[in-house]
């Protein structure tokens, strides 16, 4: 069965003007959100960007492959995907920015997001899923019985703070909990932001309690 690596071998040399953005590209960027970009990708207060190629070089100048592989982590392979991305023209020159990585024990929140500027006039907003922290897993359990979690509210604020009043089209996605955050943020963001959302991707993301499913904001983003 073909995988992401096979896709990059097949399409990695074609930019988005030749082969438009597809669901596999979404999967790739949702996985990229698991890379620890602290000190590498500019934060949301910087209004600056960095290419994936440079982010990859900077990351591997800080961490060796042996060090990464020695980690006890379910997401430790994400940096190696990033290394694969820069071997072709499809992703290497894309710009990353608006990076956030927060752990808040009091609010029981593990939150991270990054934006990828695709060069086709759209931005992919990638929310990270659960990491290896205790608070991240506790937040997952909270999502099983709370309609609104601190992380979900933070996801809405992230989308509004970075894109309210703009004009570009948005793609919003994530893997696992990140997919849930993508749907929640797209449902409850400001109307002018929601109108610009081209597509929402939840890749193996958990669902919602009935109260959310009945909300008008959620129903507006349904395909």
Model-derived regions, located:
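Short, conserved micro-motifs enriched in small and acidic residues
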Residues: 23, 149, 176
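Surface-exposed beta-strand edges and their flanking turn/coil or helix-capping segments
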Residues: 44, 137-140, 200, 215
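Short loop/turn segments at secondary-structure transitions that flank enzyme active sites
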Residues: 35, 129-133, 206-209
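Serine-dependent carboxylesterase/thioesterase catalytic core
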Residues: 152-223
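N-terminal low-complexity, Ser/Thr- and acidic-residue-enriched intrinsically disordered segments
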Residues: 1-76
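A short linear-motif detector with a strong N-terminal bias
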Residues: 7-8, 92-95, 103-105, 179-182, ...
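A general structural signal for short secondary-structure junctions and capping/turn motifs
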Residues: 19, 115-117, 219-221
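A conserved cap/lid and substrate-binding interface adjacent to the catalytic center
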Residues: 60-170, 191-197
């Amino acid at each position: 069965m073909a995988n992401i690596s096979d896709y990059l071998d097949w399409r990695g040399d074609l930019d988005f003007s030749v082969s438009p953005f597809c669901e596999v590209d979404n999967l790739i960027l949702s996985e990229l959100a698991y890379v620890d970009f602290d000190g590498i990708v500019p934060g949301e207060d910087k209004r600056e960007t960095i290419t994936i190629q440079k982010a990859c070089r900077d990351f591997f100048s800080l961490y060796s492959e042996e060090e990464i592989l020695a980690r006890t982590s379910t997401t430790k392979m994400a940096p190696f995907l990033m290394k694969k991305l820069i071997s072709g023209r499809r992703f290497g020159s894309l710009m990353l920015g608006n990076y956030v990585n927060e752990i808040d024990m009091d609010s029981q929140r593990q939150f991270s997001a990054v934006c990828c500027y695709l060069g086709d006039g759209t931005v992919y907003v990638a929310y990270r899923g659960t990491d290896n922290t205790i608070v991240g897993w506790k937040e997952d359990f909270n999502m099983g019985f709370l309609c609104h979690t601190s992380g979900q509210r933070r996801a809405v604020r992230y989308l509004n703070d970075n894109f309210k009043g703009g004009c570009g089209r948005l793609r919003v996605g994530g893997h696992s909990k990140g997919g849930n955050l993508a749907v929640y943020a797209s449902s409850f963001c400001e109307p002018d932001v929601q109108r610009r959302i081209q597509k929402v991707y939840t890749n193996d993301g958990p669902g919602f309690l009935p109260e959310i499913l009945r909300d008008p904001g959620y129903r507006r983003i349904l395909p």
